[in-house]
Structure formats: C-alpha cells, structure tokens
Amino acid sequence: MRYLFIIGAAVLLSLISGMTPAYAQRFNIGTYNLRYANHGDSMHGNGWGQRLPVIAAQIRFHDFDIFGTQEGLHHMLEGLRDSLPGYTYIGIGRDDGKTAGEHSAIFYKTGKFKLLDHGDFWLSDVPDRPNKGWDAVLPRICTWGKFREISTGYVFYMFNLHMDHIGVRARAESAKLVLLKIKEFSAGTPVILTGDFNVDQTNESYRLINESGVLRDCYELSPIRLATNGTFNNFRADGKTDSRIDHIFVSKQFTVDRYGVLTDTYRLKEDTGNKYTARTPSDHFPVMAGVEFGKGFRGR
C-alpha cells in the first residue's frame, strides 16, 4: 500500500528544535495512545498494520527520546520496537502481569538512557496484582522506570498510565495513588508522569495532580505551545476540540521549553486513484514536550 506521510502544523516544533543547539541535557518526552489493534478498526481503514509505519515515522521525525504509550498489546509493542532501531521498552500486560492485555509501556533510546530499575502497579487499592480498582470497568496499570541520562549522569523517574474511561472515583483515586507512589519511589528525585488520563484540563482528577505541588502540566509551563487541537480525535482528521485528555507532567527540577499536540496526518489513495483520504495515525494525537535538566538533578 502506498503511503504519503503529511506533516501537519506540528512540524513547527521540530523546526524550532533545529534552530537551537542540541545540548546533552535536553530531551523530548512524548505520550502516545496507540489505539489497540482490533478488527473493527481494520474494517474502517484504520488497522494497526496500516498505522504502524506511520506512527514509527512520526516518532522518528519528532525525535522522541522517551515516551509513554497506552493501549499497546504485546505484538503491537514488539512491532513498534522493531520499527524503531535504538529504542526498547518496559511494561507488562494489565490482564495477567505478563503479556496479556493492554500495556502502559515506556519506550526509550538505549543510547541516551540507562535503565536502573523499573516496575508496575495496578491502579487499585490492591496495586500489586491484576484487578479492577474502585468503580473502574477495566483493570488499569501504571509502569515506571528509573533512568540515568548517560552523558550527564542525571537520574530521574518516569511513570506512565492509562486511567479508566468510565469510573469517576477510579480516576480520582488513581491520581491520589500515583502521587503517593511517586513520593514513595522517587524520594525527591525528579519525576515525569505521562499518560491517557481520560479527563481534560478542567476535571478535578487532573487538578489533583496539577495542583499537588509535586507535578505540573507541561502545557502550563512551556513558553512555546503548539496546541491547535485537543488530543482525542476518534480517527477524524477534521475533528476539533479544546479538550486535552493526554498529558505530560513534570516535577519542578525540569525546565520545559516547548509543548505540542502533534496533529500530523497521512493520506491513503482510494481505489479510483483520483482521491486521497486523510487519516490520523491513532484515535489520539500524541503529545510532546521538550525539557531540560534544571536544578536538583544528581547522579546515582
């Protein structure tokens, strides 16, 4: 199948990056809901096999150094890793703690970061084994990693999650739980939190995190923003919303220099050969933030 990859307005972020020197202490964070592979999407022209090369090209083009994913099934994550030389990932399946079900995997460049430790917990009052928490309709999992930036020796934690899409209490309790875990694991070490939170910037569960004094939304911290759309598109290239349900939060030791909702699309040639249909790589737009190491970083 012939692909024409069309870089949208989000290309400006990469152009801006190219205008400044590439210092070792700077890197790009991403969060990307990949949309789980299913037959229904394939029947409507949005199958994973079709989308995978576009997503991989998008990640390479925007030069994600480390990024959280949501809804990735094991075979999807293996395929994405194979399509991204120089990257690997951590994370387990939410259904059995092994490979079954959706993952909240974290991908990272192996030449830039050394993995020091990692783990997973369920968004539940029983976080150490597969289960559904509170009023959630599905099991939900958070994956975390402790990383060292190789060139500087700086150490940080990254947490990545996917909150429930139905349970209101589950989302609020999940926000409290992840903040508790961040404080427990990091002990003052700088932290990144990414994910599909299934709530936008007006919701109480979002505010629990953003007003916690532990983390802040990169959207609010960035002097340069390119957010011409929200983050859930439902596979509609022409959709428009101001609602951002996919977020990147960082602790105070990071300096954020840019933020973007990446609205890139691609084109598929129809059978007639005379018309092209715009497609989004997933039913969510990925989010990217450029950050720098600031005060409070140390090597371990």
Label each region the model flagged.
Residues V137-I141, R148-A172, K176, E184-F185:
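Metal-dependent phosphoester/phosphodiester hydrolase catalytic core
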Residues F5, M19-S83, R94-E102, K176, ...:
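N-terminal, active-site-proximal structural segment of metallo-dependent hydrolase catalytic domains
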Residues G40-N46, F64-I66, N131, N160-V168, ...:
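Second-shell loop/turn segments in exported
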Residues K146, R169, E173, L180-V191, ...:
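Metal-dependent phosphoester-hydrolase catalytic domains
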Residues F27-L34, I55-L80, F107, G145, ...:
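Active-site beta-strand/loop signature of hydrolases that rely on acidic residues for catalysis
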Residues I66-Y157, G260-L262:
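Structured beta-strand-rich core segments of catalytic domains in phosphoester-bond hydrolases
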Residues I6-I16:
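Bacterial N-terminal signal peptides
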Residues L34-A37, G72-M76, R94-K98, K112-F113, ...:
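Solvent-exposed loop/turn segments at secondary-structure junctions
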